[in-house]
Design a protein with these regions (language model features):
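Short catalytic/ligand-binding loop motif for oxyanion handling, primarily in non-cytosolic enzymes
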Residues: 68, 80-85, 136, 153-157
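Acidic-basic catalytic patches of nuclease active cores, encompassing PD-(D/E)XK
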Residues: 1-52, 64-65
Length: 208
């Protein structure tokens, strides 16, 4: 989260308000090309049915692209996992647990039907659904889950989990820019993984 904050804070005075690496990444898809930041909210919580913990994105950003808005859930990684696989997340739940209702809501938002989710990391489902939910709330016509990875080789296990999630969503995981999923979500959903360098002193200074 620190690296993410530095990257975005250091870009706030730029013309587009987006970190250069992110801007370059977004420019590789027609639905996000030329994005400019409208608002960015760190640790935004998004409600879903079922109670329990809300979906808290590391950063939620609303971007403007020509004549439309894009809702972006940004998840930072630096060696940590995407929470538990769904199978483990559901293990030993009580009869009164809201988790089944929460998972059903995520399935509906992401148009997953009865697809097997046992080995899918729960956080990836939650954050991508949050991007779609916030798109609905703010009238955005596109949603994006963006993973900004700062951990280098330490993030390889998470990259593998992201690839498994992309397979679930019927899209590629190795694109150099955002990829549109094959699921028929209420607004087009894009996903993307971006490897980023750690902050250096000039970047830290710009963020202060």
């Amino acid at each position: 989260a620190f690296e993410l904050a530095v990257a975005w804070e250091s870009a706030r005075s730029t013309e587009r308000g987006i970190p250069p690496a992110v801007a370059e990444f977004l420019d590789k898809h027609e639905l996000t090309r030329g994005s400019r930041l409208v608002i960015g909210l760190p640790e935004l919580q998004v409600d879903f049915p079922g109670g329990g913990h809300q979906s808290q994105t590391d950063l939620w950003a609303l971007l403007r692209v020509r004549d439309h808005l894009v809702s972006v859930a940004v998840e930072a990684k630096s060696g940590e996992a995407f929470d538990k696989p769904v199978e483990e997340w559901l293990k030993d739940i009580s009869p009164n647990s809201g988790k089944p209702a929460r998972l059903a809501a995520l399935r509906e938002v992401l148009c997953l039907g009865e697809t097997d989710l046992a080995q899918i990391r729960y956080q990836l489902l939650h954050r991508s659904a949050a991007a779609v939910r916030m798109a609905e709330e703010y009238g955005a016509s596109v949603a994006l889950l963006l993973v900004q990875a700062f951990g280098g080789t330490r993030d390889q296990p998470s990259r593998s989990d992201f690839s498994r999630f992309a397979d679930l969503m019927l899209c590629a995981s190795d694109s150099e820019g955002p990829t549109r999923v094959g699921r028929s979500t209420c607004v087009p959903l894009l996903v993307g993984w971006l490897d980023c360098p750690t902050a250096v002193e000039p970047t830290l200074a710009d963020a202060v």
